[in-house]
């Protein structure tokens, strides 16, 4: 596609999102409309490129399948409305097999670094700024041949001085959820045979009041500003000829400004790459028993006591009788020790037993609960970005690999209670200043209900863009009372029929936040959500979260509609609390770090009540977050509790429409992991229930408990 025009240079993040292939954009100054197209750039490569490719392939298969299922159902339309066809849901050449079933073949795609994007002017649809006459060029070559002739026309009735037209590229196009766009021009000639029209705009500013008027002298004919999508028209007319009933509104395109966000939605996803491929093995459908066992270990399910005789027999059976002799000797010595020393020795004995279990010398004595077994089996159909089991395993790996407080002057993981000199606030080299800082930090963390706060200097994260949609970012859109399928389009091929996937491999600063489990449980109880079985000693909240989880669905459809009737559960409420806290954190730190809200990303681990907020970008990390902490530290966290941060500029209007809007805690689509759903300020401060909630009683805010 590069031969169609020059290339544009922007940041890698911009090229992979705002300027990704298929987008219509204008340069600075607002003149002209251009279509971005893919070019062959540097192939993505890293020391873990094989693992990254594997994770992208796994995610894409699920994304394609979920999109297909949601689009073919169209929120129940498939059962009662006009039929839906696979070609309306997924681009055939990229995501469908010969049976028109969802398919993702990694060999048809190429992973690229977004270093350049091509572009050319399109659509070449011009309007006279004086009389409103329209003129359309078919392509760049047609424009090159004929634009001088058009510019020299002298038939403008509203330019009496020279009768010349004042041509400018029209900034409105027709768009359709099939992924197509067309110039704003009548679909057919006038009934008198004339092919030229005036665009008549209304004073109301509404597109619905615009229309086309025949330019021929004396012809009174006008046309509504409508156009049928060529792709959908060809598909449905063929079905109509065979007797299938369809409605004209399925084909009608929408007039949209090319500057409007609804014209183009780039489709992206993200993940934390794990060089250790054991995560893929453990999550494989054939490893369900091993996966269940790992969950029992992570969330501290209580083990049945094992007798000394059982330990002795097990160790002797694997030729480790000597290990038991040492164990028995230590246990006998414990009797004569003082309580403190005996406690330390008992911990050593417990560690020995756990080590033998990990080596396979001693079988674990935990019976897998039926609820865990059922969830491990059911998770194959869960949306991966909300799957608490997958995210729990990821969090466990993160704990082992990245959340370890390392040594050295430049620690990669920083405990902000004891930060190194380059992150520590000024003066904390003095003991009394450091103690005052720690006291203030401990106090505000308690008021926020935060148990753990770390800073990661280099969070390894991969974000990639793989296609786009128009009109809606999700698989369905409601237009004129009918739910329509939105077609997921891939980017056009760059070579040998390979389509680009743009990969952004980032290593930027981030904050890791984990909420206080006891406070969250208390908050759930205050909102009439008690955990059905009390947690045994040491058992973690994540155990009950996983056992009670019901799939949110890949697009959170149940939580979008104003007419939804969803019961509150410990899962959707805990997720909403965690998600809202992450947004509150981003909104606050964006003011102090010098980074805009769209420069951040979020990653949630709901079963572990933890989230990561990271700087999203491919430019060198200038240490904005560490500098922010050094300069403002506790003040940033205090702002999260301030009245201003817990209110909205929209006032009660926002409060009574779910407690989340762009004026308060909603974030750009590229930042939010859940499309700004399951989000409400009410979970932080007392407020009205979310629109999706069956229970319409007010929500008790988390901060009303943590600050009490």
Predicted regions: what is each one?
Residues 1-62, 193-576, 588, 606-608, ...:
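Charged, low-complexity interaction segments
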Residues 1-167, 172, 350, 382, ...:
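N-terminal alpha-helical interaction blocks
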Residues 122-125, 166-170, 208, 507, ...:
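Conserved structured core elements
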Residues 128-131, 151-159, 175-176, 189-192, ...:
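Short cysteine-rich clusters marking metal-coordination/redox-active sites
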Residues 134-137, 160-168, 180-182, 194-196, ...:
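Cys/His-rich microdomains that often coordinate metals
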Residues 140-149, 174, 187-191, 203-204, ...:
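Short cysteine/histidine-rich zinc-coordinating motifs and their immediately flanking basic loops
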Residues 173-175, 183-184, 191-192, 577-595, ...:
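Subunit-assembly interface segments of extracellular/virion macromolecular structures
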Residues 190, 194, 617, 626-708:
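Elongated scaffolding segments in large macromolecular assemblies
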């Amino acid at each position: 596609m590069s031969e169609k025009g020059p290339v544009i240079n922007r940041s890698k993040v911009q090229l992979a999102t705002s300027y990704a292939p298929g987008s219509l954009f204008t340069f600075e100054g607002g003149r002209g409309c251009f279509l971005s197209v893919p070019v062959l750039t540097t192939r993505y490569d890293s020391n873990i490129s094989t693992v990254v490719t594997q994770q992208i392939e796994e995610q894409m298969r699920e994304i394609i399948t979920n999109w297909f299922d949601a689009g073919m159902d169209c929120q129940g339309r498939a059962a009662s409305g006009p039929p839906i066809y696979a070609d309306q849901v997924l681009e055939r050449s990229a995501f469908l097999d010969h049976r028109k079933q969802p398919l993702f073949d990694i060999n048809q795609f190429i992973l690229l670094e977004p270093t350049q994007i091509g572009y050319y002017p399109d659509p070449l649809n011009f309007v006279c700024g004086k009389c409103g006459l329209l003129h359309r060029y078919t392509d760049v070559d047609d424009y090159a041949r004929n634009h001088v002739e058009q510019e020299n026309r002298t038939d403008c009735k509203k330019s009496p001085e020279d009768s010349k037209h004042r041509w400018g590229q029209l900034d409105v196009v027709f768009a359709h959820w099939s992924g197509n766009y067309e110039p704003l021009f009548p679909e057919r000639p006038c009934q008198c045979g004339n092919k030229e029209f005036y665009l008549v705009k209304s004073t109301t500013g509404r597109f619905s009041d615009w229309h086309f008027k025949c330019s021929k002298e004396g012809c009174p004919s006008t046309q509504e500003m409508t156009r049928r999508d060529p792709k959908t028209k060809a598909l449905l007319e063929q079905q109509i000829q065979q007797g299938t009933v369809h409605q004209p509104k399925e084909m009608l395109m929408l007039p949209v400004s090319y500057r409007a966000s609804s014209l183009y939605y780039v489709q992206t996803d993200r993940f934390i790459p794990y060089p250790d491929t054991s995560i893929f093995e453990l999550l494989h459908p054939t490893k369900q028993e091993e996966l269940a066992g790992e969950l029992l270990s992570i969330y501290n399910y209580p083990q049945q006591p094992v007798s000394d005789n059982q330990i002795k027999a097990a160790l002797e059976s694997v030729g480790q009788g000597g290990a038991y002799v040492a164990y028995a000797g230590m246990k006998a010595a414990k009797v004569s020790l003082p309580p403190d020393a005996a406690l330390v020795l008992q911990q050593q004995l417990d560690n020995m037993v756990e080590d033998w279990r990990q080596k396979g010398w001693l079988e674990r004595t935990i019976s897998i609960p039926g609820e865990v077994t059922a969830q491990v089996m059911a998770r194959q159909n869960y949306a991966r970005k909300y799957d608490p089991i997958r995210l729990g395993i990821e969090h466990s790996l993160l704990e082992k690999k990245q959340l370890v407080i390392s040594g050295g002057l430049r620690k990669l993981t920083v405990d902000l209670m004891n930060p190194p000199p380059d992150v520590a606030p000024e003066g904390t080299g003095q003991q009394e200043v450091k103690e005052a800082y720690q006291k203030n930090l401990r106090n505000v963390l308690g008021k926020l209900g935060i148990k753990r706060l770390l800073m990661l200097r280099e969070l390894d994260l991969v974000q990639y863009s793989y296609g786009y949609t128009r009109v809606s970012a999700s698989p369905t859109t409601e237009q004129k009372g009918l739910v329509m399928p939105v077609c997921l389009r891939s980017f056009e091929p760059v070579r040998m029929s390979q389509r680009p996937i743009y990969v952004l491999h980032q290593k930027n600063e981030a904050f890791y936040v984990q909420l206080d489990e006891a406070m969250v449980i208390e908050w759930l109880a205050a909102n009439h959500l008690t955990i059905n079985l009390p947690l045994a000693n040491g058992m973690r909240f994540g155990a009950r979260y996983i056992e009670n989880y019901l799939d949110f669905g890949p697009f959170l459809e149940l939580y979008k509609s104003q007419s939804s009737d969803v019961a509150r559960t410990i899962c959707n409420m805990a997720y909403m609390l965690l998600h809202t806290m992450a947004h509150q954190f981003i909104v606050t730190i964006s003011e102090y770090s010098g980074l805009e809200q769209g420069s951040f990303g979020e990653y949630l681990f709901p079963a572990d009540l933890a989230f990561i907020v990271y700087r999203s970008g491919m430019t060198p990390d200038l240490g904005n977050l560490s500098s922010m902490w050094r300069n403002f530290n506790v003040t940033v966290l205090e702002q999260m509790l301030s009245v201003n941060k817990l209110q909205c500029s929209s006032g009660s209007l926002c409060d009574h429409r779910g407690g989340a809007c762009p004026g308060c805690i909603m974030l750009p689509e590229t930042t939010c992991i859940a499309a700004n759903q399951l989000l409400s300020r009410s979970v932080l401060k007392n407020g009205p229930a979310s629109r999706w909630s069956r229970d319409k009683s007010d929500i008790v805010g988390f901060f009303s408990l943590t600050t009490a």
